[in-house]
Amino acid sequence: MTVLTAPGFSGAAPTLPSVAARLACRAGNAEQTAGLAPGYVQGNLAILPENLAASFHRFCQQNPKPCPIIGMSEVGDPKIPSLGLDLDIRTDLPRYRVWRDGEMVDEPTDIMAHWREDLVAFVIGCSFSFEEALMADELPIRHIEQGVRVPMYRTNIACAPAGPFAGPMVVSMRPLKPKDAIRAVQITSRFPSVHGAPVHLGLPQSIGIKDIAKPDYGDPVQIKDDEIPVFWACGVTPQAVIAAARVPFAITHSPGLMLVTDLKNKQLAVL
Amino acid sequence: MTVLTAPGFSGAAPTLPSVAARLACRAGNAEQTAGLAPGYVQGNLAILPENLAASFHRFCQQNPKPCPIIGMSEVGDPKIPSLGLDLDIRTDLPRYRVWRDGEMVDEPTDIMAHWREDLVAFVIGCSFSFEEALMADELPIRHIEQGVRVPMYRTNIACAPAGPFAGPMVVSMRPLKPKDAIRAVQITSRFPSVHGAPVHLGLPQSIGIKDIAKPDYGDPVQIKDDEIPVFWACGVTPQAVIAAARVPFAITHSPGLMLVTDLKNKQLAVL
């Protein structure tokens, strides 16, 4: 687990953009979190009962590329001070998904009614952070240009299993010119806690993708003649694994509605 | 120019493997330098009269990926102490090529008879160094497996010209599985003074390569169905540029017969 300390939050100091974004999410005023609080890390959420949390933690430990943990709570504690002093995991995402036995049973804007003393929250790094670094280097991000969701694919790359958690790695795809793909490997290698370097490029069929035009999640994007598809491990992997495990109880974020933290993306760079 | 200091050479100390290799070359006992003194940097050689050396130096400065200078001499001085205290550039390569007006006129085992007070020697990093790092990471190098020369191609990537020196970048190609190609980008990015990260991967036609099975220099190698071609800037570029410039006088190394230096490959790693 990456241990990072966020700047402190104090009522007397100017409000951080991330805190303002989180307060807006808490108040139910966010339709999506993409674009909120630029420069700040957003994360995927997975909440599990303590009796499953150890297995899930081990799953993440063994599969750090799709499941990089950037913060987690104590058992039963809805706070994660390392990601924001005021942060309350029960209220600070715009929308949640509540799962029972592998079925989504509720999609509430807070989980006060679902919180239990045995729950553990995991916050997992997301590609927004490395996309910001790619764009800062003026690399084009096709799905952002086209205004659609990133295309994602189930692969034939098996995650290392842990307890009930097992399944294939899900990857996101961004088409790039070869020289930009090389640059993207360099840039994203600096960000191991938000999926890091690509896991694959070119040759979609080598990782079990039969039709690049038909993603399993998200939307298809154009791949130009002078571009190759570049694949990164994706934070949808743990969500798919939790759903496939049909565990008695779990809570996740609703797609596109992430947790905004007080960590800055640049803090995640290892170099 | 990368400034590095080689370990000192003293008659009293145990002889470095690089010094032993250089003495063997000096005595004319080396048929090739590949495999000599493992761990030590080998370099391409280009020697030009002072009135052309400034332009050539500027060419290298502007094209650091194909022409990374790892050492150069003072005008008229055959020593390059930073690469080896005892090193004599006139005798320490197994074989040289002497060029007049763009034609090779001699291929001697030393250049004592050709040395002049106005000559400047440039030693340029070579791919042996990064191939050693790739193999240390257990990545396969196809031309080494097949026992042939690395395939090299003229591209449509124009070098930045300087004085009479101009022309396309020449690249070397190594086929790799996509995940190994990503790893190779990371590894070779650590070695900017020996060509650094690849300049291209996949899509040979994008850089003007019409038939990957017909290299312009070296030998063809097998590319398996699950591999992509990965292209690095190549030290043949400055040699091709010197030949194309048809300069009145130049000396280079003979292909495959490089200068063995006292620098260690691991010293060249920036991380």
Swiss-Prot record, chains A, B:
Organism: Rhodopseudomonas palustris (strain BisB18)
Domain of life from the UniProt record: Bacteria
SUPFAM superfamilies: PSTPO5379-like
Protein name: Putative hydro-lyase RPC_1666
Xref: NCBIfam families: PRK05463.1
EC top class named in words: lyase
UniProt keyword terms in alphabetical order: Lyase
E.C. code: 4.2.1.-
Gene3D superfamilies per record: PSTPO5379-like, PSTPO5379-like domain
